[in-house]
Structures are given as structure tokens and as C-alpha cells.
């Protein structure tokens, strides 16, 4: 049995969100397994109403990760994203001749779990296997601040 590092995971939970679970699942399936920054970019550009509450949850999970655990947001990956059915909000709509029709508004519960990939043991083993880590020193190939250093376009 593989032990999971529980210290490497942070979650955000949104309950009783007024939308169909089926419609929310369509959006959640697009971001599951992606990095935090890539998921935010996808959610900003998708034209669905379900994107905004999910965007807020992903952002909240990253804020929890950086504040509570001290994770770097750029190193976070959405390891688990699930949508469950919630209760139906029932309303009565008045109709002619004193009748009323029942309106059911579906709700859902959304859970987003972020994982820091640098605290995951399998990822560290994979990095060692392909030569990215030498003697417990990590070789970083990413450019963190691409546009902040000035560059050619800032000069007159």
C-alpha cells in the first residue's frame, strides 16, 4: 500500500451552489489534473456559467495552500475535483385559478483538492530517475518572472 502525504494536500469545499451537478461536471472534467495557473486560465476563457463558482473555489484552495501550509501556488496541481448532487430548492409559482406549480432548483457540492507536486514522493522519485535532481538538489528549468525583469519593450 502506498502512503499518501496528507501534508501535501489542501482543499476547498463549496456547498449548495445553485446549478445542476451535470453542468458543473462538464467544467470540472476540463481542469482535473491540470496545474493551478493553467486551470485558472481555462476557467477564465470558458463561456459557461458554472466557471465562475469553480474559479472562486480553485482560487480559494490556492489561498488556503499558500496561507495555511506555505505552498507555492505555481507548484500546485488539482489532484482531485468532484461534484456531488445537493438538495433541491423547492419554490411555488402561482398560476391561474388559484393553482400553484412546483419549481425545483438543483444545487451541487463542489470539492477542489490541490496538491503540491514538490512534496509528493512519487514526483521526487521520477525527477531523480530522469536526472533532474542530483544529490537532493533540484534543477529548476522554469522561468518564474518572465515579464517583471523589464526587457526590450520597456526601453524607449
Curated annotation (Swiss-Prot):
It holds the Pfam family Ribosomal_L22. The keyword Transport does not apply. One of its GO terms (cellular component) is large ribosomal subunit. Belongs to the universal ribosomal protein uL22 family. This is Large ribosomal subunit protein uL22c. NCBIfam families: rplV_bact (TIGR01044). GO terms for biological process: translation. The lineage of its organism: Eukaryota, Viridiplantae, Streptophyta, Embryophyta, Tracheophyta. Gene3D superfamilies: Ribosomal protein L22/L17. This protein binds specifically to 23S rRNA. The globular domain of the protein is located near the polypeptide exit tunnel on the outside of the subunit, while an extended beta-hairpin is found that lines the wall of the exit tunnel in the center of the 70S ribosome. It is found in: Plastid, Chloroplast. Its main location: plastid. GO terms for molecular function: rRNA binding; structural constituent of ribosome. PROSITE patterns: RIBOSOMAL_L22 (PS00464). Keywords: Chloroplast, Plastid, Ribonucleoprotein, Ribosomal protein, RNA-binding, rRNA-binding. It comes from Buxus microphylla. Part of the 50S ribosomal subunit. InterPro entries: Ribosomal_uL22, Ribosomal_uL22_bac/chlpt-type, Ribosomal_uL22_bac/org-type, Ribosomal_uL22_CS, Ribosomal_uL22_sf. It comes from the Eukaryota.
